[in-house]
Swiss-Prot record:
Pathway: Purine metabolism; IMP biosynthesis via de novo pathway; 5-amino-1-(5-phospho-D-ribosyl)imidazole from N(2)-formyl-N(1)-(5-phospho-D-ribosyl)glycinamide: step 2/2. It is an enzyme of class 6 (ligase). GO terms for molecular function: ATP binding; phosphoribosylamine-glycine ligase activity; phosphoribosylformylglycinamidine cyclo-ligase activity. It holds the Pfam family AIRS_C. It catalyses: 2-formamido-N(1)-(5-O-phospho-beta-D-ribosyl)acetamidine + ATP = 5-amino-1-(5-phospho-beta-D-ribosyl)imidazole + ADP + phosphate + H(+). This is Phosphoribosylformylglycinamidine cyclo-ligase. InterPro entries: PurM-like_C_dom, PurM-like_C_sf, PurM-like_N, PurM-like_N_sf, PurM_cligase. GO terms for cellular component: cytosol. The keyword Ligase applies.
Amino acid sequence: MTNKNAYAQSGVDVEAGYEVVERIKKHVARTERAGVMGALGGFGGMFDLSKTGVKEPVLISGTDGVGTKLMLAIKYDKHDTIGQDCVAMCVNDIIAAGAEPLYFLDYVATGKNEPAKLEQVVAGVAEGCVQAGAALIGGETAEMPGMYGEDDYDLAGFAVGVAEKSQIIDGSKVVEGDVLLGLVSSGIHSNGYSLVRRVFADYTGEEVLPELEGKKLKEVLLEPTRIYVKAVLPLIKEELVNGIAHITGGGFIENVPRMFADDLAAEIDESKVPVLPIFKALEKYGQIKHEEMFEIFNMGVGLMLAVSPENVERVKELLDEAVYEIGRIVKKENESVIIK
């Protein structure tokens, strides 16, 4: 005779899994958009591409996680924004290629299925999807006792977007003389946290460091990653942008060259970069070499645009936010990124 409790005895709570599905339905409903087909719970998410109105559609996809920022979410028991980080990391990548996000899927793996906690995680994913204009059309929650500790979980996501074939941004339009515009980040975003955790390993998170302008350390460290989709899409539609770099792991040095050809370089005026207080604190308390900061972090610029000089004012007008002219594209001599 089959023991009905056998799976539970091995550490997998099927009933908790059902509860998670019920809890997240209202959050998923917030992300509904034209093109979504079917309901949550099917074997595959469906999307009608014809509803986008794109004449020559090219699908662009991206996948990412949030790295060890998750460890701070677990440490501080704050799980309602880490999902936004996951969405941001994916959709900011595909917007850099000129794609409008259409839909998103998430994957959560955990040692113990705690419905209330996982609802918070998915609520954050849904909020990110709303900000990106993407539908959350599916996902997976895997309870994996023995693989993860009871309080541990991992989170990854997958975004799919669409671009008009003629509006794809692949770096081929970036030329010498283009102006580099920086869009401010919300903070560290979701990269460099192995170093961040080492720097602040002996802190509780409740500290209010003088550099952080009255905010608690944990609030600054868990500030969700900014989603740039709604700010940048109008620029793409008007074909005002030649190149876009999402400044993630590897900072300026690794990511900026990804938006132009090998014979070009980015010359950046450091005095024009809007360095956020958290980066000054990290450099000070971590005793990190100043030049290395630009090899690791976004330094206050989460997205960089390469724009023809004649389009700069129109771009600023459409963005309607602080936009920083931080440099220009030059002919490459030695380095791909020159910070002066």
